[in-house]
Amino acid sequence: SLGFGNLYSTPGDHIGHFYQSREEWSDVAIPFVRAGLEAGEKCVYVIPSKVERQALLEALAATGLNTDRALATGQLELDEGTHDAKAMQDFLHRALSEIPAKYPFLRWGGDMTWSLKKLPTSESLMTWEAHCNTVDNPPAIFLCQYELRAFAGSVVMDALHTHPLCLVSNTIHRNPFYEKPEAFLRNLARRKATETTRIT
């Protein structure tokens, strides 16, 4: 279970959630992480500030979860993100290396506003997003949450191109704008050769 809306996922699902308010964000992020912890899964959530991380922990604790234990054992990792796509890829593969020896499954989520503080260009962000689609049969699901007001329209369109599934009004939809990673990265490299686009 994804933890919200009576929705279920399959291994390898990469879901884009495009939201307009923090309430929309929390209505998805909190139950998503909670469901993973309750199922004994490894949970990673990337979130940009200490204040927001603390708020997420408090919301999870309010549901009855022992967040201190989850953090201490490594079942739950809250991270602020890194400065380049390669470092994020390494982080992902380190988390995947714990499956299934320590945990049955990896639940990876992120409030993508972390990239506004960490990554220099939209190309770096989209290289990371496309990489998530190249991992063969991952024992994982990925949820990427984009605040529409925070990102340029061109970045939102690229995010659509890198997510096979989209969450809209508590319904998962196959994304008709999705491009396979090889084709997307070729197009991205072609664009990068002529222009570098800032994230905001």
What is each of the regions a protein language model found here?
Residues 1-200:
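Non-catalytic regulatory/interaction regions at protein termini and inter-domain linkers
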